[in-house]
Every structure is written in structure tokens, then in C-alpha cells.
Amino acid sequence: MLSVKQELLAALADELEKVSPGAGSRAAFESPKVAAHGDLACTAAMQLAKPLKQNPRALGEQLQAALEATPAFQKWVQAIEIAGPGFLNIRLKPAAKQQVVREVLAQGAQYGYQPARGEKVLVEFVSANPTGPLHVGHGRQAAIGDAISHLYATQGWSVHREFYYNDAGVQIDTLTKSTQLRAKGFKPGDDCWPTDSENPLAKNFYNGDYIQDIADAFLAKATVQADDRAFTANGDVEDYENIRQFAVAYLRNEQDKDLQAFNLQFDQYYLESSLYANGHVDATVQRLVANGKTYEQDGALWLKSTDYGDDKDRVMRKQDGTYTYFVPDVAYHIQKFQRGFTKVVNIQGTDHHGTIARVRAGLQAADVGIPQGYPDYVLHTMVRVVRNGEEVKISKRAGSYVTLRDLIEWTSKDAVRFFLLSRKPDTEYTFDVDLAVAQNNDNPVYYVQYAHARICSVLRGWREDYDVAALRDVDLSPLEGPQAQALMLLLAKYPEMLTAAAAGNAPHDVTFYLRDLAAAYHSYYDAERILVDDEAVKQARLALVAATAQVLHNGLAVLGVSAPARM
């Protein structure tokens, strides 16, 4: 079933096509900047005037007359007014605005979803090194990545969430050495803390309490489950490889617990080490060499990345024969593409900005059919945490930073998700712990959730065992007050808001929308009593608030936030 707006857009596209072949693709409505000007605005006449060499006002009048004669506009539109150089301001009939209530109640949790498009998108996020607990920055990335995944699902994409484990770098050696030293009884600050060439200065080791936890578990010959495999320690403090594998497995298990507390489930964990074990890294380098995209200089192998827009050529293989970190990244993204993911979105910190050009250059130089601009990137800044008016910088558990688990324990999963999504990813953000637990309108997640719970309370006041299905076909004509009209217009904007948020990888837009919707509901609730004696009026108002609760629920679900029925 087409929505009112879709019907009107289809009619507009048909009339534009008659004006100029191909112009139907320009069919679009905007929201008027001034509410008094109408419900929808159309600027097509001004866009077409120049290429058609016509007066925009005259073209607007022509389009106005044509639209007024269409069945869709006659059914749903009260008036079309022309303004300025050719703006078309459209006023909807009350029935057109009321129709969204029926759409929401009929579609339920699927309201806002688009049909399946038969394409796959891979969203890679968190991808933390298995060297310590997840910090608040990882939490921001987890919230952003999961919400973007939900947004793509609403647009008909088949979504694959992936976590890339960097388990093959220098940091893993640092983790292993740190654990080995603790297992031998050393600790930071000891006079005997090693400082020779094999064991760098203590500042280069991980000092958090979690390292001692790993060492204790290793000495106890514990077994830990990480993803799809279990690993058992042998307790031998001289068995470096056993310590390495156990420490990585232990921290992967700990990170999994953090993600579970965040209600986040990945479809796949992809190990960097597997790219080497399966020969993908060597194969990628060989392909780049065979394509003539590399050269030898100063004992190193270089990629001609400046040929693809990078600011300088990049070293691929160092003098010691090891690869630089972007080489496995190129191999990994070739694997993503060859697994059938036509679209890939990477969520990363802004400190990774410098890798974008070189990875894309490597993918183009490999010449395997990957389109330019692949993959997409969403970069986010770190998070500053404030508690009791003071910045919190250190966690005893981690030793040097506030962990995601700390933040969840201090507040809640819902608060952490909503707060970390409430600003553009590349905007600096201060997480106020005290605000996140406040039960007042200054707390945005409380404000939105309270609107949902308040509606559920009203519905229980109607019937304790209420079923909104009974409201789908009620007469909605009593919904004519200004607050009701504003609320219905906002409900109708939900699908297009999702589409725009997905296109822009902008989950913060969902938080803005939900706050506006909650405000519109509270305004309506204060203006019109819902459980009135007049049965027809009561039924119509119940249908409207039930539809509002459904959209609040749907939007919160996109963010991974619950919609409580009681608070």
C-alpha cells in the first residue's frame, strides 16, 4: 500500500515527465521552512525553468493546474498555492494527515522499512585489538556501527556485522610479554622490572589490573572460550606461544562479555592472522607487483599510491621483510568484495584518517573490479567522561582509560547507546554520567522512553489488556486540533528520516527525530485529554497515541535502545 506522500510523488513525477522527458526523477517534496506556508513544498518548477528556458513562475502555474487535476491530489490535497518565483506550497486535507495513523497501526514494527533490495552490506566496527578491555571510544563505535546496521536493514539491505581482530601485530607481543612478566611474579614499579633490549621499559607494557587477571588464570591452567573456539593454558611461564594464544583468547572472551552487556551480536569475527595463514596477504602483494604498481627503493617495496590520489607513495614491505599495517588491510578489503559485499562501511576513530587514501589506492591498484570510493568510512572522535562534575580519565581495571563496562555499570546500556549516538560521530562528545542517570526531561533517553511509557499507561487506562489492532479502523476525523496535526505530520516523516539517515550514515538523526516526536507527544497530551467520555473522540485519540508509541518503539529499536512500557 502506497503512503499518501508516495501517491502524491507518483502523480508529481508523471506530470513532470509530461513537462520534460526525464524530469520525473526530480519529483521531490520538502518541508516548508515556515509551517504556515503549508505541509509540503515543491521547487521543481524553478529547477526546470533554466534548462527549459521558461519563466519559473509560469512553469509553476502550469504544474499547479496539472497537479490539481490528478486523482491523487484531488483525494489528499486541500490546496496548492504558488509563491515567489515558482514555489508550490501544498496543504493536505485532514484525512491525508490522519492516514499515517492507519499506516503505522497496520505495519507495526515494519513501519519505515523498505522492500528487500537484494544487496549485501558489510558493516565493520569495534575491531579492537585483543590487548585490553573495550574503552569508551570502542563503545561509541559499537553504538554507531550497530545503529548504522539497523538503518541499512530498514532500507532493504542484507546486513552483515563484522569484527576484525588485529591479532598479528606488535601490540600482541607487548600483551604477551606483559602477561609473562606478571606470571613470573614481576609487577610495574619493581626494581627487577626488565629494561633490556628484549623487554623494553616498563612504560611500554600494559599495566592494568586485567593483566594480572590473565596471568593468574594462565597459572591456574584455565580454559577460556573465545568466539567459536576454546583454549587451555598450560601454566608454563616459559612457553611464550602458549601465553600469547591464551592471553588473546582471554581478552577476546572479556570483550565478548562487554559486547553482550551492550546487547551487541556480530555475525562474524575475522582474524587478521587468517589473512597471513591463508596466503591472502602474499597474494595481494604479488598481484600489485605483477600489475606494475610497486617499486623497490632503499631495500623496501613501495606502492605507487600517488597514482591513485594519495599524497605520497607508501611502503608495503619494510627492509626487514615484514609488511606495513595497511597491506593486510588491502588484502582484507579484497576479501570483503570477493565475498559479495557490494557496499562496505568501516566505523573507525579519526586517528585512522590517514589510512583511507592508501587502502583505497591499494584496492584500485589491485584491479579486481572494486569501484572507486570503496569502502565507505565513518570516522568518530573519542569521548570525554565527566562524573560528579570532574573528568574521569583512569579506570583501575584498565589502568589508563575508562572502559565501556565502567560506563554501562555507572548508567545503563540504554543510556550509553543513546548518549553516544546523540551527536554526529566526528563531533567531540562529553558523556555526563550524572545526566545519564537523571530522571528528568534534561536526560534525552529518559525523555523519549518516558513518552513511550506514558502512552502505554494511557492505553492501560483504556483497557488493561489493550490490543491496538482494535484501533486500526476507527474513525479518525476527530483528529483536527493543531497538536494532533503536528504529531501526525511528524509520524509521516519517519520513513524518509530513516532513508536520509541511512544514506548519510547518520544515526544521530534518529535521536533528533525521537526527541522531536516525544516533545510533540507531550505537547499533544497536555493539550487534549485522551480518555474522554465521547467514544468516537476517545477511539481516534487512542489510535493516534498508539501509533506514536509504535514509532517511538521502532526508532528506539534502530538505536538498540529499549522502549519500556512502565517507568
Swiss-Prot record:
Subcellular localization: Cytoplasm
Q: What domain of life does the native source organism fall in?
A: Bacteria
| Entries under InterPro entries matching the protein | aa-tRNA-synth_I_CS, Arg-tRNA-ligase, Arg-tRNA-synth_N, Arg-tRNA-synth_N_sf, ArgRS_core, DALR_anticod-bd, Rossmann-like_a/b/a_fold, tRNAsynth_Ia_anticodon-bd
Spell out the family assignment given in the record's similarity comment.
Belongs to the class-I aminoacyl-tRNA synthetase family.
Return the broad EC class.
ligase
Does the UniProt entry include the keyword Ligase? yes
- The answer to whether UniProt assigns keyword Amino-acid biosynthesis to this entry is no
UniProt xrefs under NCBIfam families = argS (TIGR00456)
Concerning PROSITE patterns, the annotation shows: AA_TRNA_LIGASE_I (PS00178)
Can you name the source organism?
Answer: Acidovorax ebreus (strain TPSY)
Residues spanned by motif 'HIGH' region: 128-138
Query: What keywords sit in the KW lines?
Result: Aminoacyl-tRNA synthetase, ATP-binding, Cytoplasm, Ligase, Nucleotide-binding, Protein biosynthesis
Per UniProt, subunit arrangement is: Monomer.
Report the HAMAP family cross-referenced here: Arg_tRNA_synth
Cite the EC number. 6.1.1.19
Mind listing the GO molecular function terms for this protein? Answer: arginine-tRNA ligase activity; ATP binding
Catalytic activity annotated for this protein?
tRNA(Arg) + L-arginine + ATP = L-arginyl-tRNA(Arg) + AMP + diphosphate
Protein name stated in the entry? Arginine--tRNA ligase
| GO cellular component term, pick one | cytoplasm
Gene Ontology biological process terms from the UniProt entry: arginyl-tRNA aminoacylation
